[in-house]
């Protein structure tokens, strides 16, 4: 896809939603990290339902450790993979306290050392907390990017690299959120709402399916 078309797409995203934000509800840097860990293979809505109560009291690494793994499980048991997530969160709390004075590191290599933190989670944290121009590729971003024509790769890592190359840096602070929101509400997996899509005239899928 040509650079001028990519810019046009993100100009439209920016005009319609100048300051997109994560749908995850959090109180501080640490609670965002926990929320993102919990969001793996879970919806933001389901995560917010449990963290609403969890974060009222337990919103620091020290407090989560005091709660303990079994106590944490009771709060998050409605979320998929809650057993492994509880174990990872407790282990991450221990590392944060021991190595980072209970703060969240602003370095990708340090973040992915934390149990339960993979490439996507680290990129979300760096983007949301530190406004770094990262590209977290979840299922929405992966699908939308390929459908629009922004990327062609068959893995999330390849798509991430393609997006970082093709998207102008001035858009990267918000690009992840725009693509997620577009995938969640417009460019849905089974039935994309192409007729009401603001970027359809630039979308390869729409052009090939409806405009040809």
Curated annotation (Swiss-Prot):
Where does the source fall among the domains of life? Bacteria
Q: Which InterPro entries match?
A: DNA_glycosylase (IPR011257), Endonuclease-III-like_CS2 (IPR004036), Endonuclease3_FeS-loop_motif (IPR003651), HhH-GPD_domain (IPR003265), HhH_base_excis_C (IPR023170), HhH_motif (IPR000445), Nth (IPR005759)
Keywords for the protein's UniProt record, in alphabetical order: 4Fe-4S, DNA damage, DNA repair, DNA-binding, Glycosidase, Hydrolase, Iron, Iron-sulfur, Lyase, Metal-binding
List the catalytic activities from the record: 2'-deoxyribonucleotide-(2'-deoxyribose 5'-phosphate)-2'-deoxyribonucleotide-DNA = a 3'-end 2'-deoxyribonucleotide-(2,3-dehydro-2,3-deoxyribose 5'-phosphate)-DNA + a 5'-end 5'-phospho-2'-deoxyribonucleoside-DNA + H(+)
Residue ranges of the HhH domain?
A: 108-127
Per its UniProt record, what SMART domains does this chain match? ENDO3c, FES
Mention one GO biological process in which this protein takes part, according to its record: base-excision repair, AP site formation
GTP-binding recorded as keyword: no
What would be an example GO MF term here? class I DNA-(apurinic or apyrimidinic site) endonuclease activity
Give the note describing cofactor binding and stoichiometry.
Binds 1 [4Fe-4S] cluster.
| CDD domains attached to this UniProt entry | ENDO3c
* Family as reported in the entry's similarity comment: Belongs to the Nth/MutY family.
Describe the function of this protein: DNA repair enzyme that has both DNA N-glycosylase activity and AP-lyase activity. The DNA N-glycosylase activity releases various damaged pyrimidines from DNA by cleaving the N-glycosidic bond, leaving an AP (apurinic/apyrimidinic) site. The AP-lyase activity cleaves the phosphodiester bond 3' to the AP site by a beta-elimination, leaving a 3'-terminal unsaturated sugar and a product with a terminal 5'-phosphate.
Q: What is this protein called?
A: Endonuclease III
């Amino acid at each position: 896809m040509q650079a001028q078309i990519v810019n046009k797409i993100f100009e439209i995203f920016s005009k319609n939603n100048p300051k997109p934000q994560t749908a995850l509800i959090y109180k501080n840097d640490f609670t965002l990290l926990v929320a993102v860990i919990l969001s793996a293979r879970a919806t933001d809505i389901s995560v917010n339902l449990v963290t609403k109560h969890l974060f009222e009291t337990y919103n620091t690494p020290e407090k989560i450790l005091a709660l303990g793994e079994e106590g944490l499980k009771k709060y998050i048991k409605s979320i998929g993979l809650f057993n492994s997530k509880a174990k990872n969160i407790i282990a991450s709390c221990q590392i944060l306290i021991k190595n980072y004075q209970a703060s969240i590191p602003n370095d990708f290599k340090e973040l992915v050392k934390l149990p339960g933190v993979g490439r996507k989670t680290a990129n979300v944290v760096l983007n949301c907390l530190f406004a770094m121009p990262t590209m977290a590729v979840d299922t929405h971003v992966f699908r939308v990017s390929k459908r629009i024509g922004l990327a062609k790769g068959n893995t999330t890592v390849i798509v991430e690299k393609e997006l970082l190359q093709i998207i102008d840096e001035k858009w990267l602070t918000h690009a992840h959120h725009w693509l997620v929101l577009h995938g969640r509400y417009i460019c849905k997996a089974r039935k994309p709402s192409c007729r009401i899509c603001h970027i359809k005239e630039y979308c390869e899928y729409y052009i090939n399916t409806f405009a040809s």
